[in-house]
């Protein structure tokens, strides 16, 4: 629709009530419900924070000239939507466009923060949002020592005769060996998320109990690894996608969400072994996650990396009742809060309403959304959270320009992440992880060591300081100033540049 094409995207995520429109490019997910406009020449700006009703809102941005001669940014609240209702179970039959029976019921509130003088810019907006989160949203300032994130894939499955067979990528013994090698190179502070550790591998979801796949070494051996890692100052977390159920491996007849047109929601994976996934109802997620956590914690460990529910919201129907995004948000918030009380919890790219319950932000995005009317790429989220919460990047493995990506890590203060396997990624060719085209430890060992040493040295100068100023100079130069007085100069250009008496070589950085 015409207005939607100008929007930045829905606050939070998916609306299962509706069939998906075919568009050239989906709107971006909005991780934090904020927006703003700055008149830098006049030293005035505002920040808008959607405080209530954000689960069913979108952030709209319309540049001048599109319809009127003003730049506009605002929150649009959705009260009632239309959906496509098939007239029969026959896919070739007709359909009707039907309105939702009831409009959504929620308070709607936007807080505006007005900024002036030196604060009338995007850094001032980020600082204002940070202050709001610390003061009003229960976010605690818990930035800690630098760590490099090294994740492992345990097992996957590939098709074999009438079923599937195991593809073992990284065992418990392999991880011990990798930790020993990295420690001998001076890499001691690590955070690890172990994926595909459970019986029958990565896509055997949901996880209902604490049972490790025997091919990686079994439950007892995994438990010992987690405990031993902790004694070496390595934080090892087990990965759990609490949202999805694999209908090829688990009974998905009940407890899965349906769209309002009564059709079961199916997420297409575009992979060969398991082509679709379903979503669990939030009530079922609560039941299964509590069951897993109870058995996991009882074993004497409790580091958990939660995915799926951390960055997905939807409306759905179940057993004849309709549940809104507000219902899902409230349920997920309770689930995550309860999990955080029982475990040491980290969340995968969490929405803002869950930030107070996570010890770290996994998969922090570092690049722009690439909208045509964008002028500059601003690392807004990392400016907000730097010095408040440890942030870990998306995987270095899959970045085409690793030199530029490294400088992004320097600019944002985000810690590096690697997705590692002991075996060659060629073994994953016929699995659902076929998109992991480069992961072998021997390929990335030197890079892990290099990133660790250089970025740790930078962190020791910055410590737990927050960003007080972020400047863009002549497109290629970024200047980041921290609250402890340290300034970092980054040069993305092809030529050496001198700024403030500091010479920065091409594709390099300097710290003062």
Where are these regions (language model features)?
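Structural preference for beta-strand elements that scaffold enzyme active sites
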Residues: 189-191, 235-237, 302-305, 344-346
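Glycine-centered small-residue hotspots that permit tight backbone geometry or close packing
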Residues: 7, 213-220, 387, 502, ...
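Single conserved hydrophobic/aromatic residue that forms the stacking wall/gate
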Residues: 1-12
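Terminal accessory/anchoring regions of large secretory-pathway or extracellular enzymes
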Residues: 113-151, 155-191, 434-457, 461-464, ...
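Active-site-proximal substrate-binding groove within the catalytic cores of carbohydrate-active enzymes
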Residues: 18, 25-27, 31-73, 85-88, ...
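Extended acidic/polar, glycine-enriched regions
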Residues: 10-139
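Short loop/turn motifs at secondary-structure junctions
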Residues: 7, 186-189, 299-300
């Amino acid at each position: 629709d015409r207005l939607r094409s100008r929007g930045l995207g829905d606050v939070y995520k998916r609306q299962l009530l509706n069939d998906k429109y075919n568009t050239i490019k989906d709107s971006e997910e909005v991780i934090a419900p904020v927006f703003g406009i700055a008149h830098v020449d006049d030293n005035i700006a505002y920040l808008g924070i959607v405080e209530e009703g954000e689960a069913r809102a979108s952030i709209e941005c319309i540049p001048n000239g599109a319809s009127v001669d003003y730049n506009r940014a605002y929150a649009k609240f959705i009260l009632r939507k239309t959906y496509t209702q098939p007239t029969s179970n026959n896919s070739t039959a007709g359909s009707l466009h039907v309105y939702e029976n009831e409009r959504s019921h929620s308070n709607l509130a936007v807080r505006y923060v007005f900024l002036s003088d030196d604060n009338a810019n995007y850094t001032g907006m980020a600082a204002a949002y940070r202050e709001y989160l610390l003061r009003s949203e229960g976010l605690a300032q818990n930035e800690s020592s630098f760590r490099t994130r090294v994740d492992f894939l345990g097992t996957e499955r590939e098709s074999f005769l009438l079923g599937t067979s195991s593809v073992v990528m990284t065992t418990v013994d392999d991880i011990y060996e990798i930790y020993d090698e990295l420690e001998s190179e001076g890499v001691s502070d690590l955070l690890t998320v172990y994926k595909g550790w459970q019986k029958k591998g990565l896509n055997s979801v949901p996880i209902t109990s604490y049972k490790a796949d025997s091919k990686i070494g079994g439950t007892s051996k995994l438990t010992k690894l987690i405990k031993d890692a902790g004694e070496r100052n390595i934080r090892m977390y087990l990965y759990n996608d609490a949202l999805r159920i694999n209908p090829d491996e688990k009974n998905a007849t009940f407890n899965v969400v349906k769209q309002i047109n009564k059709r079961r929601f199916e997420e297409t994976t575009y992979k060969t072994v398991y082509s679709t996934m379903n979503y669990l109802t939030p009530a079922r997620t609560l039941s299964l996650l509590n069951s897993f956590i109870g058995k996991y914690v009882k074993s004497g460990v409790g580091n958990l990396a939660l995915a799926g529910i951390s960055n997905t919201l939807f409306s759905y129907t179940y057993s004849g009742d309709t549940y809104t995004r507000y219902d899902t948000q409230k349920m997920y918030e309770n689930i995550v809060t309860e999990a955080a009380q029982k475990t040491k919890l980290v969340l995968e790219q969490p929405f803002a309403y869950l930030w107070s319950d996570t010890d770290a932000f996994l998969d922090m995005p570092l690049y722009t959304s690439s909208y045509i009317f964008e002028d500059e790429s601003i690392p807004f989220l990392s400016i907000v959270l730097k010095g408040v919460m440890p942030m870990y990047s998306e995987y270095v493995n899959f970045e085409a320009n690793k030199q530029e990506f490294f400088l992004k890590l320097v600019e944002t203060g985000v810690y590096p992440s690697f997705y590692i396997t002991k075996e060659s990624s060629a073994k994953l060719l016929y699995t659902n992880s076929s998109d992991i085209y480069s992961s072998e430890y021997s390929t990335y060992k030197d890079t892990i060591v290099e990133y660790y040493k250089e970025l740790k040295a930078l962190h020791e100068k910055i410590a737990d300081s927050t960003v007080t100023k972020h400047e863009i100079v002549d497109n290629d130069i970024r200047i980041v100033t921290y609250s402890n007085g340290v300034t970092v100069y980054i040069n993305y250009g092809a030529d050496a540049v001198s700024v403030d008496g500091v010479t920065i070589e091409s594709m390099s950085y300097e710290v003062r």
